[in-house]
UniProtKB/Swiss-Prot annotation:
PROSITE patterns: ODV. This is NBPF family member NBPF9. Encoded by one of the numerous copies of NBPF genes clustered in the p36, p12 and q21 region of the chromosome 1. It comes from Homo sapiens. It holds the Pfam family Olduvai. Residues 165-181, 530-539, 550-562 have a biased composition (Acidic residues). GO terms for cellular component: cytoplasm. Residues 161-198, 451-474, 510-569, 829-871, 999-1033 are annotated as: Disordered.
Length: 1111
């Protein structure tokens, strides 16, 4: 059986769908929420996993301790900051409490002052009415007594107004005594009743002031009437009354915030802004409880804020750390979250900083306000104390008038005087209680009172007598003192008319007024003494500075530093002339001057300045004014070791022995031996004025009659027209510290001394390192030998930057590969010895030398050029080799001329690496065969020398000398050095001696004249003797051997060829030139016998000089 169901109807289907939808909607919303939460959790989990993986990957475990430590420090820092903020809040609260209490106290004191001022003015008016009665009859008798009683009542009321509450018992006792006195007097009963009724009205004015000085701030058990303030001068305290329930520490903090300053401000300078009244203990407790109640919720709120802040700070720190890590690994998906968290952290920090600044500013304002109120309170308390003292003295004075001991004295003129005194006391009281803005009114009232007192009928004698016999009233006269001292310029009565007595029972001996009054009184008591002293000093005339200082030290009392330095110790018109030099007058050390002026000597110079010329003290600029027309020129070291008067002085004038010409800072490293200079100067006084060494006055010397000396001497000295350098320096300085400039040589000083001793008996010694040659006048000296002529630098030389003596750096070979150190002390000794031989005839000495030269070789003074000075007028022309052995006058001399026997020519240390090209030499010799006269090797000067009658010398001698036509190097050097130290420069050549002899024989046939005759003559002379060759000496040229024959051919060719490119120095023959046996050269020349036969007569040289240099 088949069952068939029909379809649902459309309505039923719709109903079912709607119901299903309604059921599923909340499930769908719930599922969506769950999905969102799950997605967020998944994201956070992914983030945490990513950070964990990164930390694990980069071994982040090592940084855990560091992270914890940093977070712990951060938390501790936050806690400290929060504690500091709480402390500031508590301090601010205490300041607020203090400010409120001070405001109330100020208000009460102001009110009391106002009431006291009104009462004192009414009392003053009452007494004025008594002093000037309209009806004379009423001023006598009973009416006067009543009026005086009324004045006493007013005075008592004033005392009550101005008295604090702790004096209430004393005031009541005083009032009882006054009542008894009034009852005893004849005053009617009605007056007493009226007075009592008026006294009872002062209830509010007699209320107590809150703060007590006698007990602690928390003691509140005593009744209200016993809690009073005592305004004492020494102890003024602004104690805050705090609740007993509040902690004692807080009370002490409130008390110790600010110390109360003493009474320093003016009593009349009262300007008040805030006013406050005193609080009783109950009121104080109420206020404190209210404040505590208000502050408790604030404190709880602050604590909660602190906890929230701490938690937020920790979270922010952690988020910042995570953000930094994510940023480091470029986690892009978390950028928004990172920015948000960092922005919150920065905003939080800015808010906290702004809050702290606000609290600090508020606290500062409260502090300023508290200080101002403290000062104002101190002034008001001082004013109240003074007014209270004045009112008591006035009250006692009126009581004395009311109860006279002798009735006769209370009548008449005496009564008028006492009433005038009472009026004066009342006026003084009004002044004490008045603020500054009432000063003008008080002055007008005072003027009126003074006029009334003058109009009274009291005779002058009684007033004077009364001034002497005023009864000793302790407190009133203490107040009287300050009435006259309160403005000595404002009061009409003189200060001296008041008799002052002091009692020490209750009040201090002097009333402390304003600081301005105290300072003015100090000025009054201190300044007149000084003024009188100044007047006496002005009458005596101007005092010297020393006396003035002594008088000031003896007479002027020691004041405060402020007054001591606020006035000039010397009158203004005396400052410029009487200030000593020890003051800041010569404060030139602030202007680059480091000198100490001899003050005593300068003062003595100032005293004598009127009668004689002012002597310039050392280190003074007055050196510019000195005149020295007759002073002879001293040696240069003396001349330049002292500052000249015409020098353009610098900013610092320094003593003589200083580095005035700081030449060691300007290319010079010399230390001047001043003691040696002084010794040298003393020696020069007995001699002729010597040439100032290294002086610029060499330019001014004239030698009109000097004949032409030997060219050597003429040219061996620097000309007067030389362009001298910038520096003149003494001998014994460190100028020639040549050991610092490439020096490696120490001269044999013993040999030098020995040579110097030998020179003393011979010709004139050559002053080494000296320029005094310019001063020696030798009018009859004939022309010297040619070698001497050419061995000296010409006057046309281009001199270098420094003109210096011979052995010095003048020929700065030391700066150009020179290594020798001069014995300067020995040079000075030689220089002094030369002065005794200055201008004597040198012919005798030369003749003696010539006689001695026959048996010995003439000594060569090393490092000297004075050989040029020897006169040999009759010397004949020397042999041609001697002619050529000297450098020609036409040589282009270098910048340096140097002595003969130095180690200048240690060319093995120079740049010699020469290998002679023998083939080139042979080729050059063959080319010469077709030319004119044979060119002697090592010489080019044969082309320039004209020798019409000179006999031909031996050819080997001719060639053994360097030519004068050579292109000379930078230095002219002596013969006997290590010129040919070629074995040290790896020159390993062997000369073909046979070839050289062959070439030499071929050249002998081409001489200008017949050289055979000369050689034959020389050979005949050489058979009997061999002339000695003194090594390292240029004087070989002076040995006379006129008949020497021609030398051997090997001697001829033992000299280097003329085509050699000569190095920087000409050197002596007897050097290590022939040390070729060390370099496998197998020829030994017989040098001692046949090489140096270079002696000729003097006549030959004279003839040669006349030919070459005709005059």
């Amino acid at each position: 059986m088949v069952v068939s169901a029909g379809p649902w109807s459309s309505e039923k289907a719709e109903m079912n769908i709607l119901e299903i939808n309604e059921k599923l909607r909340p499930q769908l919303a719930e599922n969506k929420q769950q999905f969102g939460n799950l997605k967020e959790r998944c994201f956070l989990t992914q983030l945490a996993g990513f950070l964990a993986n990164r930390q694990k990957k980069y071994k982040y475990e090592e940084c855990k301790d560091l992270i914890k430590f940093m977070l712990r420090n951060e938390r501790q820092f936050k806690e400290e900051k929060l504690a500091e903020q709480l402390k500031q809040a508590e301090e601010l609260r205490q300041y607020k409490v203090l400010v409120h209490s001070q405001e109330r106290e100020l208000t009460q004191l102001k009110e009391k002052l106002r009431e006291g001022r009104d009462a004192s003015r009414s009392l003053n008016e009452h007494l004025q009415a008594l002093l000037t009665p309209d009806e004379p009859d009423k001023s006598q008798g009973q009416d006067l007594q009543e009026q005086l009683a009324e004045g006493c009542r007013l005075a008592q009321h004033l005392v009550q107004k101005l008295s604090p509450e702790n004096d209430e018992d004393e005031d009541e006792d005083v009032q009882v005594e006054e009542d008894e006195k009034v009852l005893e007097s004849s005053a009617p009963r009605e007056v007493q009743k009226a007075e009592e009724s008026k006294v009872a009205e002062d209830s509010l004015e007699e209320c107590a002031i809150t703060c007590s000085n006698s007990h602690g701030p928390c003691d509140s058990n005593q009744p209200h009437k016993n809690i009073k303030i005592t305004f004492e001068e020494d102890e003024v305290n602004s104690t805050l009354v705090v609740d007993r329930e509040s902690s004692h520490d807080e009370c002490q903090d409130a008390l110790n915030i600010l110390p109360v300053p003493g009474p320093t401000s003016s009593a009349t300078n009262v300007s008040m802004v805030v006013s406050a009244g005193p609080l009783s203990s109950e009121k104080a407790e109420m206020n404190i409880l209210e404040i505590n109640e208000k502050l408790r919720p604030q404190l709880a709120e602050k604590k909660q804020q602190f906890r929230n802040l701490k938690e937020k700070c920790f979270l922010t720190q952690l988020a910042g750390f995570l953000a930094n890590q994510q940023n480091k690994y470029k986690y892009e998906e978390c950028k928004d979250l990172i920015k948000f968290m960092l922005r919150n952290e920065r905003q939080f920090k800015e808010e906290k900083l702004a809050e702290q600044l606000k609290q600090a500013e508020e606290l500062r304002q409260y502090k300023v306000l508290v200080h101002a109120q403290e000062r104002e309170l101190t002034q008001l308390r001082e004013k109240l104390r003074e007014g209270r003292d004045a009112s008591r003295s006035l009250n006692e004075h009126l009581q004395a008038l009311l109860t006279p001991d002798e009735p006769d004295k209370s009548q008449g003129q005496d009564l008028q005087e006492q009433l005038a005194e009472g009026c004066r006391l009342a006026q003084h009281l009004v002044q004490k209680l008045s603020p500054e803005n009432d000063n003008d009114d008080d002055e007008d009232v005072q003027i009126e009172v003074a006029e009334k007192v003058q109009k009274s009928s009291a005779p002058r004698e009684m007033q004077k007598a009364e001034e002497k016999e005023v009864p000793e009233d302790s407190l009133e006269e203490c107040a009287i003192t300050y009435s006259n001292s309160h403005g000595p310029y404002d009061s009409n009565q003189p200060h001296r008319k008041t008799k002052i007595t002091f009692e020490e029972d209750k009040v201090d001996s002097t009333l402390i007024g304003s600081s301005s009054h105290v300072e003015r009184e100090d000025a009054v008591h201190i300044i007149p003494e000084n003024e009188s002293d100044d007047e006496e000093e002005e009458e005596k005339g101007p005092v010297s500075p020393r006396n003035l200082q002594e008088s000031e030290e003896e007479e002027v009392p020691q004041e405060s530093w402020d007054e001591g330095y606020s006035t000039p110790s010397i009158p203004p018109e005396m400052l410029a002339s009487y200030k000593s030099y020890s003051s800041t007058f010569h404060s030139l050390e602030e202007q680059q001057v480091c000198m100490a002026v001899d003050i005593g000597r300068h003062r003595w110079d100032q005293v004598k300045k009127e009668d004689q010329e002012a002597t310039g003290p050392r280190l003074s600029r007055e050196l510019l004014d000195e005149k020295g027309p007759e002073v002879l020129q001293d040696s240069l070291d003396r001349c330049y070791s002292t500052p000249s008067g015409c020098l353009e002085l610098t900013d610092s004038c320094q003593p003589y022995r200083s580095a005035f010409y700081v030449l060691e800072q300007q290319r010079v490293g010399l230390a001047v031996d001043m003691d040696e200079i002084e010794k040298y100067q003393e020696v020069e006084e007995d001699q002729d004025p010597s040439c100032p060494r290294l002086s610029r006055e060499l330019l001014d010397e004239k030698e009109p009659e000097v004949l032409q000396d030997s060219l050597g001497r003429w040219y061996s000295t620097p000309s007067g027209y030389l362009e001298l350098p910038d520096l003149g320096q003494p001998y014994s300085s460190a100028v020639y510290s040549l050991e610092e400039q490439y020096l490696g040589l120490a001269l044999d000083l013993d040999r030098i001394k020995k040579d110097q001793e030998e020179e003393e008996d011979q010709g004139p010694p050559c002053p080494r390192l000296s320029r005094e040659l310019l001063e020696v006048v030798e009018p009859e000296v004939l022309q010297d030998s040619l070698d001497r002529c050419y061995s000296t630098p010409s006057s046309c030389l281009e001199q270098p930057d420094s003109c210096q003596p011979y052995g010095s750096s003048f020929y700065a070979l030391e700066e150009k590969h020179v290594g020798f150190s001069l014995d300067v002390g020995e040079i000075e000794k030689k220089g002094k010895g030369k002065k005794r031989r200055g201008r004597r005839s040198k012919k005798k000495r030369r003749r003696g030398r010539k006689e001695g030269e026959e048996n010995q070789n003439p000594p060569c003074p090393r490092l000297s050029r004075e050989l040029l000075d020897e006169k040999e007028p009759e010397v004949l022309q020397d042999s041609l080799d001697r002619c050529y052995s000297t450098p020609s006058g036409y040589l282009e001399l270098p910048d340096l001329g140097q002595p003969y026997s130095s180690a200048v020519y240690s060319l093995e240390e120079q740049y010699l690496g020469l290998a002679l090209d023998v083939d080139r030499i042979k080729k050059d010799q063959e080319e010469e065969e077709d030319q004119g006269p044979p060119c002697p090797r090592l010489s080019r000067e044969l082309l320039e020398v004209v020798e019409p009658e000179v006999l031909q010398d031996s050819l080997d001698r001719c060639y053994s000398t360097p030519s004068s036509c050579l292109e000379q190097p930078d230095s002219c050097q002596p013969y006997g050095s290590s010129f040919y130290a070629l074995e040290e420069k790896h020159v390993g050549f062997s000369l073909d001696v046979g070839e050289i002899e062959k070439k030499g024989k071929g050249k002998k046939r081409r001489g200008r004249r017949s050289k055979k005759e000369r050689r034959r003559g020389r050979k005949e002379g050489e058979e009997d003797q061999n002339p000695p060759c003194p090594r390292l000496n240029g004087v070989l040229m002076e040995v006379e051997e006129p008949e020497v024959l021609q030398d051997s051919l090997d001697g001829c060719y033992s000299t280097p060829s003329m085509y050699f490119e000569l190095p920087d120095s000409f050197q002596h023959y007897r050097s290590v030139f022939y040390s070729f046996e060390e370099q496998h050269i197998s020829f030994a020349l017989y040098v001692d016998n046949r090489f140096f036969t270079l002696t000729v007569t003097s006549l030959h040289l004279v003839f040669q000089m006349e030919v070459i240099f005709p005059q």
